[in-house]
């Protein structure tokens, strides 16, 4: 999250410099400080609790102050001399907690999803392999734990693979909603204190910094007051978790025994 806040501050400094609102020397120092944070430096300077009131204002200002003080050092000044680089006037220029924090949150979720998707894809492939390996094994199919009709064990594992594939597709669809940001809307979506140049360049600049295909929301008021994209991805993750839990419970039941349980499979 902190690194993504730094990426936003870097993109903002670039855009404000190009808009000729931020002097080149200050912008260069801010960008350099942001790059240090993105690289994992200065971690001990971020002391604000992750759980906080005020919609993230304290986290936003913590980042602004760290970047400002580091930029001051880079320019040869003394930390705390905000006449050189100011946390709010320069680092936070044309921004608000209300567009910075949700955008950083979306970037952070986007950063975390690839590991999950890779794990799910590996699981999907393994289940498909098992469905082929077990395709010749007959077993009893059941409804409400009562014997129903015969089926192949491979069919059960193919069903699990199909379920996981559906989870993958669902997460990928939800992921796309996170590419839309309200950056440039500032406090409530009015774009107050943001130049026209900044408004039209901040998101493309951030896209270049992050490598994500980001786009600015068509309605900045809606994107500022409604964060249903987070709800969508949360719902898909919960659905995936429920599916995984159900599959694990099935396998646990089928491996029960060995004397008085089902004992149809052996879990390694």
Regions from the language model: what does each represent?
Residues 1-268:
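Conserved, well-structured ligand/cofactor-binding cores
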């Amino acid at each position: 999250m902190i690194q993504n806040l730094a990426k936003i501050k870097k993109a903002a400094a670039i855009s404000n410099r190009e808009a000729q609102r931020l002097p080149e020397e200050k912008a260069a120092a801010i960008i350099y400080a942001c790059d240090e944070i993105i690289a994992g430096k200065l971690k001990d300077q971020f002391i604000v609790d992750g759980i906080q009131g005020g919609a993230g204002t304290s986290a936003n200002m913590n980042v602004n102050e760290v970047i400002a003080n580091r930029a001051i050092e880079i320019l040869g000044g003394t930390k705390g001399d905000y006449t050189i680089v100011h946390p709010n006037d320069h680092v936070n220029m044309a921004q608000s907690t209300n567009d910075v924090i949700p955008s950083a949150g979306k970037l952070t979720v986007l950063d975390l999803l690839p590991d999950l998707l890779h794990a799910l894809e590996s699981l999907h492939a393994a289940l498909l392999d098992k469905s082929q390996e077990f395709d010749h094994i007959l077993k009893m199919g059941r409804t409400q734990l009562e014997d129903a009709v015969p089926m192949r064990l491979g069919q059960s594992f193919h069903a699990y693979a199909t379920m996981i594939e559906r989870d993958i597709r669902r997460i990928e669809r939800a992921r796309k909603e996170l590419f839309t940001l309200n950056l440039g809307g500032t406090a409530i979506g009015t774009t107050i204190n943001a130049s026209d140049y900044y408004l039209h360049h901040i998101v493309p600049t951030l896209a270049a910094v992050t490598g994500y295909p980001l786009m600015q929301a068509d309605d900045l008021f809606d994107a500022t007051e409604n964060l249903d994209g987070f709800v969508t991805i949360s719902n898909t993750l919960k659905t995936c978790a429920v599916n995984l839990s159900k599959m694990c419970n099935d396998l646990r039941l089928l491996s029960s025994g060995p004397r008085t349980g089902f004992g149809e499979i052996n879990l390694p």
